Amino acid sequence: MKTVEVRVAGPPDLPKINKLIDMAVMNWPMPTRLKRLASPILQYDLVDLGFLKVFVATFNGQVVGVAAWDIATLQVLPNEAGGLFHGLYVLPLIQGQGVGKKLMSTVFDDARCHQVNGLLIKAQRVSKNYFAHQGIQALSMDEGDYPYKYWKALA
């Protein structure tokens, strides 16, 4: 989608961001009850905007994608320290058209500007193939809260 614009999100964007997250989660291949319970937990609020850098992708003034990273907290990894890629959601109807890739590039560029040498991505099972397809390095699986983790080196 060539006319998609990416910008930093602000408080007025939160209702649209959370509606988009809800639509994306409801499209996940899992039981409806689980999706209904998971969606509110994944949504952002004003407190999140205080410590996350959130970007929105817009098309004709509508929010069609969102990505966020934790600008304050450094994640310690075996050989590196970096930030946390917090979330990536794209309107289900336009997935596969480059919106997610554009949002990720924006997050990666912003992290580089903040001299972060890499980002840890904790992926849900439904999105693990997406990050692998993007060529992002998979880390070894574990039994923790997110068994699918990826490392995007930025340095």
Regions found by a protein language model. Name each.
Residues 113, 125-149:
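Conserved active-site alpha-helix within GNAT-family acetyltransferase domains
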Residues 56, 62-71, 84, 89:
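Conserved beta-strand in the GNAT
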Residues 22-44:
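Conserved GNAT-fold acetyl-CoA-binding loop/helix
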Residues 104, 111-124:
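Conserved GNAT acetyl-CoA-binding A-motif
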Residues 4-19:
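A short beta-loop-alpha structural element at the N-terminal edge
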Residues 78-92, 148:
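Conserved acetyl-CoA binding element of GNAT-fold acetyltransferases
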Residues 44-56, 84:
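A short helix-loop-beta-strand connector motif used in the catalytic cores of GNAT acetyltransferases and
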Residues 94, 98-106:
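Conserved acetyl-CoA pyrophosphate-binding loop and the N-cap/start of the following alpha-helix
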